Amino acid sequence: MAATKANIYFKGVEIPTSSHPEIKKLKKKSNVHYMHGNKVWNSTLILMELFADINFNKEKIADLGCGWGALSCFLTKKGADITGIDSDVNVKPYFDLMCKLMDVDTKFCVQNIFSDEFDISPYRTFLASDVCFWDVHTDLWIKFINKIIKENKRLIMCDPGRESFWNLLDQCDMPYQIINRRINSPRRVDSYITIFGE
């Protein structure tokens, strides 16, 4: 379905935009996001479309840089045992609102995924959409990818094709699969899905 000013209706769920009344209330009383968790990014919709017909059957998934949690909550409805992870504590009220709108109880964790303290052992699959903003993080992502591949885990990354994303792929020695995916509704989105690991 098409987007309204305040909502996106997609794959059977309601996703608030920055114009949603509850989002406006949160922005008035909440701290400013210091990362990029200030909206639902387009690559999230691409992954939602990709996973729409899959029953995850309690698969343990980590949604890295989850922001408002649209993907986390959507996959909870699809049967995943998913945790939304973000380094910005200020996205938590937005994540809670998303849970309320989608009628789910999805786990949320504040964590720097590049820290040695981040325990990857509970998860089989890691998702990351629209996270490649800065070249300064390229080495950190490569280290993280190497870490999970050695543990026979996988990362599914989605990005519209930023220069920093291509730089990451150029510098990463690990094999990967890449797919270009497009949707025309509720927004016109063109992104690249990259899969590291089996």
Where are the regions that the model predicts?
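S-adenosylmethionine-dependent methyltransferases
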Residues: 1-198
